[in-house]
Amino acid sequence: MEPFIKHKGLVAPLDRANVDTDAIIPKQFLKSIRRTGFGPFLFDEWRYLDEGQPDMDCSQRPVNPDFVLNQARYQGASILLTRRNFGCGSSREHAPWALKDFGFRAIIAPSFADIFYNNCFKNGLLPLVLTEAQVDRLFKEVEAAPGYELEIDLPEQQVRTPAGEAFEFEIDGFRKHALLEGLDEIGLTLQHAEDIRAYEARRREQAPWLFTDLEEGR
């Protein structure tokens, strides 16, 4: 995964609460487990005027001009600002895959659904919790200023506005470490590869019968 240290990017405001995973990436796109290629179908039922299907050429589809991500001022946005309980509904890791593939590096909201929140960290996407009052204020500033950007400083755990104001946010230390180092669960495990090999060597000496079938099956 790409490390997340500091990120400055354009903010897109999705002014909706309780956005569920079926809205983020509809069920017909869940057959693939490639992790990539979902960006064009992010918020599919809101972005387009027709019904999306896997492998469609989205460049030829009629778009909904009123949807925020179709508006010219938010093209290239990498930070999504939204409302409480984002990512609720059924569990599907495709939701953070679609957000990441679209180009988002972080999502700011007052709260997230637990499973979605956990899945974001596993895929290098930062779900960042601010207070309702702070989110309300950011919505007003984003809508009033085209080209509005925020800077997210993960080491300092701060969100900085164009005016220089800083909002503090909390994050679990282990998850912070994984994002800073760009490590997913496999990468974190491989950091302990030497310890794992040493443990296996000790176990092979202490209980060789446990490894007999493995050796015979080589």
Swiss-Prot record:
Protein name (Swiss-Prot/TrEMBL): 3-isopropylmalate dehydratase small subunit
Chemical reaction(s) catalysed: (2R,3S)-3-isopropylmalate = (2S)-2-isopropylmalate
Source organism: Alkalilimnicola ehrlichii (strain ATCC BAA-1101 / DSM 17681 / MLHE-1)
Domain of life: Bacteria
Pathway: Amino-acid biosynthesis; L-leucine biosynthesis; L-leucine from 3-methyl-2-oxobutanoate: step 2/4
Record-level GO BP terms: L-leucine biosynthetic process
Gene3D superfamilies assigned to the protein according to its UniProt record, in alphabetical order: Aconitase, domain 4
Purpose: Catalyzes the isomerization between 2-isopropylmalate and 3-isopropylmalate, via the formation of 2-isopropylmaleate.
EC assignment: 4.2.1.33
Any GO MF annotation of the entry: 3-isopropylmalate dehydratase activity
InterPro entries in the cross-refs: 3-IsopropMal_deHydase_ssu (IPR004431), Aconitase/3IPM_dehydase_swvl (IPR015928), AconitaseA/IPMdHydase_ssu_swvl (IPR000573), IPMI_Swivel (IPR033940), LeuD (IPR050075)
